[in-house]
Every structure is written in C-alpha cells, then in structure tokens.
C-alpha cells in the first residue's frame, strides 16, 4: 500500500529493460523488513554503488568489444577500390587503437573487481574503471559506426545500437564527472 509504479519511459538506448518511476506515498516498512540498521540507508546505498560501477565498467567493455567484433566482420566483407576496407591502413589503425583501449578498460575492470573481492578500498578503482571504460565504449562505438559508413547509422546494423547503448554508461551509477570527483578525492587533491 502506498506504492505506485508509473508508465514505462521510452529511452534512447538500453531498451530491453523497462524504465519507470516508482512512487512511495506514506509507505511504512515493518522493522523486521529493514535492510541494515535504521539511519544507515544512505551508507548502504553508496557502498552498493561501488559494485554497480564495476558492473557498468564491464558492461562498457562488452558493448565496445561487441562493436569491434561486428566491425571486424564488416571490414572483411565491404569492398572499396577492389579490396576489403579492412586492408586499408586507416581501418587497421582505427581498429588497433580501439582494441588497445578496450583491453586497457578490461584490465581496469578486473583490477577494481579484485580490489572489491579482497575487501580493500575499491571505491576509487570502481570509479576509475567506470569512467574510463564508459568513455572508451563511447569512443569505440563512434569509430565503429564511422567504419561502417552510412550503414553504421542505420538500425539494421548492430553498431548503431551499440552507440546508443554506450551513452548511458557515462551517466548511470554516477556521472563520469562524479567519478572524477571520487578519483581526485582519493588522491587527496
């Protein structure tokens, strides 16, 4: 009683899951149903965000790697000037740069996850991996769309969806600007 779920809100990306407003009006939670101790909700929520940020880092790596994988298939098939566009140095260099950044992001995700598993102060590592990996996902998906040319802008091709899906990773579980505040705070700036 007192709980209302609003209508689904259409989004630019990550459209497989519903997104709706949840409204609480005069909701009472019995003491036996409390998670943690009374007054500790904010602290618990902030702790959970750290693990979520590692998940967003991993999601970002997956989006970027998927875009690269699709682009690799495409550049082997698409021909220009009588040869596959994957044979051109510009294409090779763009893909090499993208893969290098994705692998660096993957290592940052692993580092943050390891720190969390070892019960260390993983908050700055979670912030770094989320910030870096989401930035990489957005850059890599843009490059992949570019390599697809006009096709990359069409819903028929998966890199278009990857580019839309990548954007939210810079926003949820804390914006990348907030991640920079956490990182710089851990540096005692």
Describe each PLM feature range:
Residues 1-73, 80-83, 175-189:
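FAD-binding core of flavoproteins
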Residues 14, 120, 124-189:
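Alpha-helix capping/hinge segments and adjacent helical runs
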Residues 48, 67-74, 111, 143, ...:
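Generic, well-ordered alpha-helical scaffold segments in large soluble proteins
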Residues 61, 65-68, 102-109, 137, ...:
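Hydrophobic faces of stable alpha-helices that mediate helix-helix packing
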Residues 72-86, 99-132, 145-148:
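C-terminal helix-coil-helix/basic helical segment that borders enzyme active sites and/or dimer interfaces
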């Amino acid at each position: 009683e007192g709980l209302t779920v609003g209508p689904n809100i259409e989004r630019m990306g990550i459209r497989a899951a519903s997104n709706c407003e949840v409204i609480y009006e005069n909701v009472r939670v019995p003491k036996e149903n409390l998670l943690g101790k009374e007054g500790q909700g904010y602290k618990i929520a902030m702790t959970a965000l750290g693990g979520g940020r590692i998940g967003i880092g991993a999601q970002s790596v997956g989006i970027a790697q998927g875009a690269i994988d699709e682009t690799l298939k495409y550049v082997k098939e698409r021909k220009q000037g009588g040869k596959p566009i994957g044979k051109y140095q510009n294409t090779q260099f763009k893909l090499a740069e993208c893969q290098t950044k994705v692998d660096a992001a993957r290592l940052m995700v692993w580092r943050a996850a390891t720190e969390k598993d070892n019960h260390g102060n993983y908050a700055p590592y979670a912030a770094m991996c989320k910030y870096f990996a989401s930035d990489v996902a957005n850059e890599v998906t843009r490059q992949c769309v570019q390599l697809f040319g006009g096709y990359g802008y069409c819903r028929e091709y998966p890199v278009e969806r990857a580019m839309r899906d990548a954007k939210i990773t810079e926003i949820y579980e804390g914006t990348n600007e907030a991640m920079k505040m956490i990182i710089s705070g851990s540096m005692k700036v």
